[in-house]
Regions:
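C-terminal helix-rich "cap/oligomerization" subdomain common to oxidoreductases
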Residues: 1, 69-72, 226, 300-343
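Beta-loop-alpha module in the N-terminal Rossmann-like domain of NAD(P)-dependent dehydrogenases
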Residues: 19, 50-112
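Active-site loop of classical SDR/Rossmann-like NAD(P)-dependent oxidoreductases
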Residues: 38, 240, 283-296, 310
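Hydrophobic residues in well-ordered beta-strands that form the structural core
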Residues: 56, 72, 94-95, 120-122, ...
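Rossmann-fold dehydrogenase core element
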Residues: 108-125, 145-152
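Predominantly a Rossmann-like dinucleotide-binding segment in NAD(P)-dependent oxidoreductases
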Residues: 126-213, 332
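Contiguous beta-strand/loop segments that form the cofactor/metal-binding neighborhood of enzyme cores
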Residues: 182-263, 292-305, 342-343
């Protein structure tokens, strides 16, 4: 029997627990080695549930457990330090999006992985969700011609965690919610984003007790791609009707719509799962297959010593687009993504 790839999951919140369950139960070539969680009560609960030890920091785990790779599912402002430490210890790294807060951090993480000779993969789940994969394949096959216009949206039903309310600790909702969109439109169009113009609004923050400056719960970004294509990204969090993720690509010869679940031309949706058509109640339900697929891809890539499907350059590109969009709405002007080359 081939040895299984041993994984330490860092962060036992919603995403971390999902990755831990998948590593433990859904990927035959992998096994869960341990949980790393700063809150010992949370870490021990997940560890006990899955039958593995829990540690309160990565240094303890490196000293006390054997593993081949890590999954980083902690707040964004901790990603760089953890990734550099793990890579320096010779561990392969799967990092949840957003990759980091700044491009300098992205570069540090990428360099650490390169110098250590380990795989570094970023968790852009849509690249592994079957309907998105099929859309990419059809676009590459030329079924709709050359992409001209792309529209992508993500709406989440709950408030982000408190640390994500603060722009300087998270880069805001455009990072926490819409990083997926920035990556997805690059991937589907096959082109880098050249210029962005963003507008934001705050409709629900005050009534839900959010006091952080520069907080917003709605955003729209218009895009121009290097290829000449145009696009829009929008995000809302919280969107009380449920979790929603869709993309539309208009080409010179046709249209692809991914994630549409509407049976009527006029539709009203209010409560999660109780409207005129069913809605997804959470991101984990919407992308269940994708989360299994991305972790399986990481394991396969690490075992083979291959190039990851979604690497550090992809994570960096999304961070650059997010930061340019934040500069755009803060300064009220279009911003070239290349101007964020160092920040």
């Amino acid at each position: 029997l081939k040895p299984r790839f041993r994984i330490a999951v860092i962060g036992a919140g919603r995403a971390g627990r999902l990755h831990a369950v998948n590593a433990s139960q859904s990927i035959s070539s992998a096994e869960l080695s341990c949980i790393v969680e700063a809150d010992p009560e949370v870490g021990n609960k997940v560890g006990d549930e899955l039958g593995v030890p829990a540690f309160t920091d990565l240094e303890q785990a490196l000293a006390g457990a054997a593993f081949d790779g890590v999954v980083i599912a902690t707040p964004t402002f901790t990603h760089a330090q953890l990734a550099v430490l793990a890579a320096g210890a010779g561990k392969h790294v799967f990092c949840e999006k957003p990759m980091a807060l700044t491009l300098d951090e992205c570069d540090e993480m990428s360099l650490a992985a390169d110098e250590a000779g380990v795989v570094f993969e970023v968790g852009f789940v849509r690249r592994f969700q079957p309907e998105f994969v099929e859309a990419k394949s059809r676009i590459e096959a030329g079924e709709i011609g050359r992409p001209m216009l792309v529209k992508s949206l993500t709406r989440g039903p709950g408030l982000p965690p408190p640390w994500a309310h603060e722009l300087h600790r998270s880069n805001g909702m455009l990072a926490e919610v819409n990083s997926h969109d920035f990556d997805c439109v690059r991937w589907l169009t096959g082109s880098e984003i050249e210029r962005v113009f963003a507008e934001t609004a705050n409709f629900k923050g005050a009534e839900r007790g959010v006091t952080a400056p520069d907080y917003y719960d709605n955003a729209v970004v218009t895009l121009r791609f290097v290829s000449g294509a145009l696009g829009t990204i929008d995000g809302t969090c919280p969107a009380d009707y449920g979790y929603d993720a869709r993309v539309e690509v208009l080409g010179t010869e046709g249209l692809l719509v991914v994630g549409q679940n509407q049976a009527t031309s006029l539709l009203k949706i209010r409560a999660r799962g109780a409207g005129e058509v069913p809605t997804y109640v959470s991101w984990s339900q919407r992308f269940e297959a994708g989360y299994r697929g991305e972790l399986a891809s990481f394991v396969k890539t690490a075992l083979a010593g291959a190039v990851p499907e979604v690497g550090a350059a992809d994570g960096r590109a999304a961070v650059a687009a997010v930061r340019a969009s934040n500069r755009s709405w803060l300064e009220g002007r279009p911003v070239l993504v290349a101007s964020e080359s160092v920040a």
